[in-house]
């Protein structure tokens, strides 16, 4: 039996149960010789009027919505998936609640902070993704300070792994994209971005946690940091005049009318880089969680436990893949940030390279010419 058939049968059963609901009791037939009249409904509207059915459906919908709010969350598959990937003010955790030890306790951040962080229309109340970023920042400080205070010449265990990652970011990412001279200036930012994104990605795989990097606002903020540092590096390397001249796309002054086309194109190109960083990290982290939730949701959508024998192993394999993706996405964001920063430095380096090349060409040519003359003298002699 195919999945489509199972879904069709489930829908048919639910519709049949809905149609089999007891109908309202009809008004009594003629009594004492009077003509039958429709009994008034609960809202005081005669049942024979067309508006009665509309009012009844509206009241039922209102009652269902209120019950949904009182009962907690919508239990549909789509609502559950969105609940686990979107941001909010409620953090679920195990603990003592509901009269005992429970797994579905809730910490409402709005009740904790109240109106203390509201300034007019600006609401600074932290959400669960903000809490995850606080935890990632605290863990980053603990790991870095612990690695710095380690006095042994040969670090072991976790600190050996941390030192390996730091050396990898510097030598394989920063140095190769910026050069030895400029790498040390921007390595602290690249290392911070790498570990911060890595911790946020790993937090999203823990129970009762949330994936902050699957929030578009978080990835936009991270990309803006890279954007600002990239523009700072370019202006520092080329100067404001060289930076503005670079927006012409290398078109000479003799073709100045083409600047009307090149300057807008180059200006928009400045923002395509942070846009790529934003969408790449956001989409990759969001997609993995959606796939896991969809595979597990098949058990409840199809209404049979036998689906678990296929969906659970598949979800577990995707979960293990997400562990790898957590490192890969942190690496890609750091690599692209290094490339974009290095792109602002390369023009400055090229100018120096050409100057040095032309500066050394004269003496080299002179010495080469002198050697030819010296070598030819004995022959002529």
UniProtKB/Swiss-Prot annotation:
Compositionally biased tracts (Basic and acidic residues): 60-73, 351-360
Ranges of compositional bias, category Low complexity: 47-59
Transmembrane segments: 128-148, 190-210, 215-235, 255-275, 290-310, 316-336
Region feature (Disordered): 24-73, 351-381
UniProt subcellular location: Cell inner membrane
PROSITE patterns assigned: ATPASE_A (PS00449)
Protein's UniProt keywords contain Nucleotide-binding: no
GO cellular component: plasma membrane; proton-transporting ATP synthase complex
Membrane protein topology class: Multi-pass membrane protein
Keywords: ATP synthesis, Cell inner membrane, Cell membrane, CF(0), Hydrogen ion transport, Ion transport, Membrane, Transmembrane, Transmembrane helix, Transport
Pfam families: ATP-synt_A
Top-level taxon: Bacteria
GO molecular function, one term: proton-transporting ATP synthase activity, rotational mechanism
Gene3D superfamilies to which the protein is assigned, alphabetical: ATP synthase, F0 complex, subunit A
Quaternary state and interactors: F-type ATPases have 2 components, CF(1) - the catalytic core - and CF(0) - the membrane proton channel. CF(1) has five subunits: alpha(3), beta(3), gamma(1), delta(1), epsilon(1). CF(0) has three main subunits: a(1), b(2) and c(9-12). The alpha and beta chains form an alternating ring which encloses part of the gamma chain. CF(1) is attached to CF(0) by a central stalk formed by the gamma and epsilon chains, while a peripheral stalk is formed by the delta and b chains.
Biological role stated in the UniProt entry: Key component of the proton channel; it plays a direct role in the translocation of protons across the membrane.
Family: Belongs to the ATPase A chain family.
Name the UniProt record assigns to this protein: ATP synthase subunit a
Organism: Anaeromyxobacter dehalogenans (strain 2CP-C)
Source organism phylogeny: Bacteria, Pseudomonadati, Myxococcota, Myxococcia, Myxococcales
């Amino acid at each position: 039996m195919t999945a489509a058939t199972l879904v069709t049968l489930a829908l048919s059963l639910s519709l049949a149960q809905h149609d089999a609901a007891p109908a309202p009791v009809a008004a009594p037939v003629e009594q004492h010789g009077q003509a039958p009249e429709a009994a008034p409904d609960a809202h005081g509207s005669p049942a024979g009027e067309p508006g009665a059915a509309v009012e009844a459906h509206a009241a039922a919908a209102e009652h269902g919505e209120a019950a949904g709010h009182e009962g907690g969350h919508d239990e549909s598959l789509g609502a559950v998936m969105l609940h686990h990937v979107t941001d909010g003010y409620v953090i679920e955790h195990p603990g003592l609640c509901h009269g005992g030890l429970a797994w579905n306790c809730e910490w409402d951040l709005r009740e904790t902070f109240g109106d203390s962080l509201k300034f007019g229309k600006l609401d600074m109340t932290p959400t669960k993704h903000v809490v995850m970023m606080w935890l990632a920042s605290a863990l980053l400080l603990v790991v870095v300070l612990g690695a710095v205070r380690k006095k042994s010449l040969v670090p072991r265990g976790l600190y050996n792994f941390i030192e390996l990652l730091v050396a990898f970011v510097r030598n394989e990412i920063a140095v190769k994209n910026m050069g030895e001279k400029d790498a040390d200036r921007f390595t602290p930012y690249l290392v911070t971005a790498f570990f911060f994104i890595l911790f946020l990605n790993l937090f999203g795989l823990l129970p009762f946690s949330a994936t902050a990097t699957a929030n578009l606002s978080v990835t936009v903020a991270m990309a803006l940091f890279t954007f600002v540092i990239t523009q700072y590096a370019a202006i520092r390397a080329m100067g404001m005049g060289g930076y503005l001249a670079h927006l012409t796309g290398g078109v000479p002054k003799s073709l100045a009318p083409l600047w009307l086309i090149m300057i807008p194109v180059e200006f928009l190109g400045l923002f395509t880089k942070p846009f790529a960083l934003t969408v790449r990290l956001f989409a990759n982290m969001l997609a993995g969680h959606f796939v896991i939730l969809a595979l597990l949701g098949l058990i409840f959508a199809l209404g049979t436990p036998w689906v678990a024998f296929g969906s659970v192993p598949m979800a577990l394999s995707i979960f293990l893949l997400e562990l790898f993706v957590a490192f890969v996405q942190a690496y890609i964001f750091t690599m692209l940030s290094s490339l974009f920063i290095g792109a602002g430095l390369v023009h400055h380096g090229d100018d120096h390279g050409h100057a040095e090349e032309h500066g050394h060409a004269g003496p080299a040519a002179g010495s080469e010419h002198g050697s030819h003359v010296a070598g030819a003298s004995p022959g002529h002699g």
